[in-house]
Amino acid sequence: MQTDFDVIVVGAGPSGTAAAFRLKRFGYQVLLLDKQQFPRVKPCGGGISIKALNLMPWSVAPVIERAVKKLGMGVSSRATERYEVFEAQGYVCTFAVREAFDNFNFGKAVEAGVEFEHSSELSEIDERGDFVRATLGNRTITARYLIGADGANSTVRRLLSAGRWFYRGFAMEGLVSYADVGAEPLAAFFFGKVANGYGWLFPKGDHINVGLYTWDNTVTLSKEQLRAYSIDRIESDKLERIIGFPIGFGGRNYVQNRERIILVGDAAGFAEPLLGEGIHNALKSGQAAASAIIAFDDGRSSSLRLAYKKELGPIHNDLVRCENLKSFFYGNLAGIGYGALRFPVSKIALMRGFAAGKTMYELTNTFFLSPLFRPAQPPALYAHCER
């Protein structure tokens, strides 16, 4: 059947733009849908790991506001609080405002020829043999494939009645102007500030992103908790734009229940639960979905399900490892969990791994090779925003 497009991508965040851009490069006609116009406000801590930067098909240096070689890591318990500075020779993390980061990537996809449509009216998805039909308001559009990249509260996942594997974690953030604090703090994680999670301080260009995270959906985060954490860490309760948001987990058990419809990123639960990072696996799964479609069309796989499962192999391995580490680390936080983290050999390996852009699966499998790891990002690229 002749369809309107080759691929419809629902959601224009990191996973959606990654998929759309790769498909367009291979000659596919792609429609990118999003319920919001760009630029749009997107709640997120805005930490962009080196492993995520390594996946980008273009430099995002213009929207990076801080690049750091040091991270503060602390742990709080009823009995005590401990804190140390972890340092590497190369950048271990960068920070951006998600509104700017997403808009930059969206612009690159549109520049490449991806067609965009603003629509919040997706109400039905129907797979019919060799094509997919999507209903938008009072009209329908067709494509050979559809990719759901619409986040933790995915409409695509809901319409498919999919996601028994899926669960949500939560985060809450607020912004504090540098004018309201004495000095710019070190980028830092404070584990144990909330149950089964941590508090963060992420410095940006003119403000600090202050936040709380938990992978445990039985834990409630509140504005009062966030203000108390901000007062405790930077002696300021002047938080602006406080907002909570879900994070999609459970993707280690992702099941594709349609042949021509794929979920990616948080819609598939591909955020890793150890630290709650979602951008790396969003990019990687978006690219994986595109590669799976291309492989299936080229006859290199007998089904799209098998092609996507193969492409997801590295993500699956890392999610399993992060789930196991999550259980060990947070379950023994005040004792051996944080103790293992700050053990000199672990400390060095961790920071070298971060700087080299290693996943947790790669890092733990090559732990004793960490002296051979080299920083992945050129120093000159982010010298303008190094702190």
Regions found by a protein language model. Give the residues of each.
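Beta1/beta-strand and adjacent pyrophosphate-binding region of the FAD-binding site
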Residues: M1-G13
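Hydrophobic anchor at the start of a short beta-strand
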Residues: V7, Y28-V30, L146
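Predominantly flavin-linked oxidoreductase catalytic cores and closely associated redox partners
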Residues: A12, K108-D237, N253, G269
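N-terminal Rossmann-fold NAD(P) dinucleotide-binding loop
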Residues: G16-T17
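Glycine-rich FAD pyrophosphate-binding loop
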Residues: F21-P43
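A conserved beta-strand/loop capping segment in the N-terminal third of enzymes
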Residues: S49-F104
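FAD/FMN-dependent oxidoreductases across multiple families
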Residues: E124, N217-I293
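C-terminal helical "tail/cap" subdomain of flavin- and related membrane-associated enzymes
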Residues: S291-R387
